[in-house]
């Protein structure tokens, strides 16, 4: 999308808070948990970008990416989905990348960023919503009023979880979702556009007989 942004301005967290119970829930639902960096153009032309744990379906190409391997999925209007797979760590892949850079320097080769210099870059936005799975030890750590809605919740003696929709701004501005052993994982199709939220709210009111 031609965007160059500092990492501090991108919503991210790792897999450090994922619990065994989360893995068991994933297995029951036929899902895997992967750390995914995602960039998607919204209906308003702006771009949503983040790096967060996410559920993927068994059989999804990303579900087969394990250990030192990385996978990249690219989707375009003309080429549909393309999947790239290969080693992203280890001595040989690292040595190959370093050798490639040394060779590029020797021949004065420079990487091109045509979209940055010859096109108007798209704009990042945090004005959208995400559908999340959230597991936790106690309800007192969870600000339920911050959710647009909660569509599922489950409670055991030791661990609880819910599935609901949150504004991304809530995750950016607050840290409760990665404290007190709280685990947040995006659902399979997590991004909900502002326009979709407005439509869903209107439809809910119509079904309730308010409009």
Where are these regions (language model features)?
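Substrate-binding/catalytic subdomain of NAD(P)-dependent oxidoreductase enzymes
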Residues: 1-64, 69-71, 90
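Catalytic, metal-anchored helix/loop core of enzyme active sites in primary metabolism
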Residues: 48-134, 209
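Residue-identity detector for glutamine
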Residues: 16-19, 38, 54, 82, ...
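Context-gated lysine
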Residues: 27-29, 34, 40-46, 57, ...
